[in-house]
């Protein structure tokens, strides 16, 4: 459900129906991908590397508790990490990120019925907050083995890009809320699309192209 929800969150009602993009939701335990081509969902893929895999890598390599490893991982982005631990944490995260980028490459290679893959990539989810993920996607040449027509551009999805949902609390501030907002949007949409003979896929495609 999550990749479809993220797709719905990005496209909205008034978005260009010819939208093509790769959407990635990096959660705690998995990474979910959805490929949108000309406004339709071409499929979704999932593999088991999320934010906790990076924490476990730090835990294992540095010989610390899971809680301490999580603090080190988060501290790397906020510059609140002991200087003596920085290199070890960076090395642990880098090794896991290299495996993760291999998972992205493998997942996208399975969309072999498309002539080419969309060059726009949008990330969301708490796991995507790690700077090293963006660095791997933007700095490596992993995409050259796949049918991209140009180097992909990578961005986080912003809450203000979610059509039809307005945050009046001021608390929804970044990409970590996008999946929940997308699920809310799909829940609202399903009340409007109630064709008894339609499959879930048909309903989702109708929502995406509305």
Please place each PLM-identified region on the residue numbering.
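Short glycine-aspartate micro-motif
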Residues: 21-25
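Short, flexible segments with low predicted structural confidence
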Residues: 29-30, 109
């Amino acid at each position: 459900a999550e990749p479809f929800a993220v797709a719905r969150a990005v496209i909205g009602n008034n978005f260009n129906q010819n939208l093509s993009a790769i959407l990635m939701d990096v959660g705690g335990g998995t990474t979910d991908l959805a490929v949108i081509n000309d406004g339709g969902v071409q499929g979704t893929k999932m593999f088991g590397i999320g934010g906790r895999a990076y924490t476990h890598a730090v835990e294992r390599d540095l010989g610390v508790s899971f809680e301490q490893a999580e603090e080190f991982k988060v501290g790397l982005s906020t510059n609140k990490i002991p200087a003596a631990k920085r290199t070890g944490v960076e090395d642990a995260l880098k090794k896991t990120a290299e495996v993760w980028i291999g998972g992205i490459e493998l997942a996208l290679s399975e969309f072999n019925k498309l002539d080419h893959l969309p060059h726009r990539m949008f990330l969301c989810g708490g796991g995507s907050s790690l700077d090293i993920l963006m660095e791997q996607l933007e700095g490596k040449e992993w995409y050259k083995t796949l049918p991209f027509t140009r180097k992909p551009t990578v961005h986080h999805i912003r809450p203000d890009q979610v059509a039809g949902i307005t945050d009046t609390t001021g608390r929804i501030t970044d990409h970590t809320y996008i999946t929940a907002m997308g699920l809310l949007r799909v829940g609202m949409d399903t009340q409007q699309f109630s064709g008894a003979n339609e499959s879930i896929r048909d309903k989702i495609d109708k929502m995406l192209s509305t």
